[in-house]
């Protein structure tokens, strides 16, 4: 719609195309391939035609069969495979119509990066009327849900919010991950990061 397209996650042609590009990147020297938008579209289904019927079981099957094959082929070249997913799947077991399920997807990646951006949580999430203004509590709660569901710390590497937040609020994003002994990535669409985000990092890591 509006000139934008989603590939069908069940299409062998599309899947092989993506895997082949990932393998080329490995051969060029990159040590990790992270799959973004590893999901079904979340709206406007009336415009879409899928190879398989758009059911929960088929969505989960297609996302994970792609990752399973991709991981096998990419790992064989010495590269890690990771994926970023919506933060809500850490807490909810339903896939939200997009084919992301925590227990299955974690088995088919080396690392998982849930996008636990506080601004993306709705009012009342984890008991916060304004989740975006409570980054530490929101992220801690989301990560606790993942760890409680058996995700290993070494595989969990959240995306943190590097936009719409002050330096102090980004620091709270980071502190939430550091307090769980997790690696993390900060996301900003323009790749613009203030040094102030990281001013307290040494003191947290030396605890």
Stretch-by-stretch model annotation:
Residues 1-9, 43-53, 126-128:
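Surface-exposed, active-site-proximal loop segments in enzymatic domains
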Residues 8-16, 57-64, 133-140, 167-171:
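Soluble non-cytosolic domains of exported or imported proteins
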Residues 28-58:
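Active-site-proximal loop/short-helix segments
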Residues 34-35, 59-99, 152-165:
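Aromatic-lined carbohydrate-recognition surfaces of secreted/lumenal glycan-active proteins
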């Amino acid at each position: 719609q509006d000139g934008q397209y989603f590939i069908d996650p069940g299409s062998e042609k599309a899947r092989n195309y993506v895997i082949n590009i990932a393998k080329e990147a490995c051969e060029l020297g990159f040590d990790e391939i992270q799959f973004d938008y590893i999901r079904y579209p979340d709206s406007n289904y009336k415009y879409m035609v899928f190879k398989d019927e758009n059911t929960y079981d088929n969505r989960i099957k297609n996302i994970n069969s792609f990752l399973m094959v991709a991981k096998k082929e990419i790992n064989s070249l010495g590269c890690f495979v990771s994926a970023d997913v919506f933060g809500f799947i850490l807490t909810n077991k339903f896939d939200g119509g997009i084919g992301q399920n925590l227990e299955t997807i974690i088995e088919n990646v080396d690392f998982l990066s849930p996008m636990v951006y506080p601004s993306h949580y709705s009012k009342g999430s984890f008991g916060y009327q304004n989740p975006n203004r409570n980054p530490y509590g929101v992220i801690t709660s989301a990560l606790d849900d993942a760890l409680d569901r058996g995700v290993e710390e070494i595989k969990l590497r959240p995306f943190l919010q590097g936009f719409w937040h002050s330096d102090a609020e980004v620091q709270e994003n980071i502190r939430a991950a550091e307090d769980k002994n997790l690696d993390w990535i900060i996301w900003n669409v323009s790749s613009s990061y203030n040094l102030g985000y990281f001013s307290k990092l040494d003191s947290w890591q030396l605890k």
